[in-house]
Design a protein with these regions (language model features):
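A structural signal for short, well-ordered beta-strand segments and their strand-loop junctions
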Residues: 35-38, 81-84, 89, 106-109, ...
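A glycosyltransferase accessory/donor-loop signature
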Residues: 46-51, 129-141, 145-276
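A short, conserved beta-to-alpha structural element at the edge of catalytic cores
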Residues: 107-130, 269-273
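Short loop segments at secondary-structure junctions
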Residues: 41, 75-77, 145-149
């Protein structure tokens, strides 16, 4: 039984972020297998596998998450957790894996939190919940296996990712269509269209900290982005704090400026130390 994590990255910033994420996974999940999914030809010590995309996309790709539909075919693992590259993992997933494998073909979180562990309202997805009766689903961390049900999900996801503008134009009123690709909405559409249950039995399963939604919900101080008004600290034993709050979950930080050499070195060096 093979299980592992898949991270997508193509640009230089994404590749740096993916390496940080891989190191964080291996610190908290020592025997974890981590795969980099990319269009590039490269080698990197942080990854156990490096896989290239199976399919070329003729459509304009402005967000790597438009390639989510390829994950089923590209993952080298029987059981996969896919995580957005702009994330760090600060928790063990032993119990999570056991739950997911035993209960789901595909599973997406239904709740995201702020760095204080408060559940976020998510004003953007809430309008689709209110107007179109969609149950919220989040796509920055989700699980799938190689079953027929999972294949059904990714086949459905394919045209949504490729032609998301037409999809939103067909499904939603004009004022509810987005100008930018919004991965959470695409996965929400797919999740609510399945004949099988993709939602976890507990809201805490797969839940993660989403600093982008915390920012857009307006619960943080004003600024260009959350890093302009909040401090982040890492240590040489790969701990992480935002303000005075220790991060002990999956953190989706969203902003490219989160990544810096100090954080990257702290996590890389600590992973190498504990694996000696």
């Amino acid at each position: 039984m093979s299980r592992g994590y898949v991270i997508q990255a193509d640009t230089d910033p994404e590749l740096y972020q993916a390496e940080l994420l891989a190191n964080s996974i291996k610190i908290k999940n020592k025997n974890a297998q981590v795969c980099l999914l990319t269009s590039r030809n490269l080698e990197a010590d942080a990854f156990d596998d490096i896989v290239k995309y199976e399919f070329f996309m003729h459509e304009e790709v402005v967000d790597i998450r438009q390639k989510d539909w390829q994950l089923y075919w590209c993952s080298p693992y029987e059981y996969t957790i896919a995580i957005d590259c702009k994330s760090v993992v600060m928790e063990s997933h032993d119990n999570l894996w056991e739950y997911l494998i035993d209960n789901h073909s595909v599973c997406l979180p239904t709740v995201v939190k702020d760095f204080r562990n408060n559940t976020l309202v998510d004003k953007q997805l809430s309008k689709y919940e209110q107007e179109y009766k969609y149950k919220k689903a989040y796509g920055n961390c989700f699980y799938f296996d190689k079953s027929e049900e999972s294949l059904e999900y990714f086949k459905f996801l394919d045209p949504l990712c490729r032609d998301w503008r037409s999809t939103e134009g067909f499904l939603f009123q004009k004022q509810h269509a987005n100008k930018k690709y919004y991965s959470n909405l695409i996965h929400t559409i797919a999740a609510n269209s399945m004949r099988f249950d993709v939602f976890p039995t507990s809201n805490d399963m797969l839940s993660y900290i989403d600093m982008d939604i915390a920012w857009s919900d307006g619960i943080l101080p004003d600024g260009e982005n959350w890093l302009d008004v909040m401090s982040v600290w890492s240590t040489d034993i790969a701990t992480l704090k935002i303000q005075n709050y220790s991060i002990n979950n999956i953190l989706y930080y969203h902003e490219d400026s989160f990544y810096n050499n100090e954080i990257a070195d702290d996590f890389r060096n600590y992973r190498e130390t504990i694996n000696k």
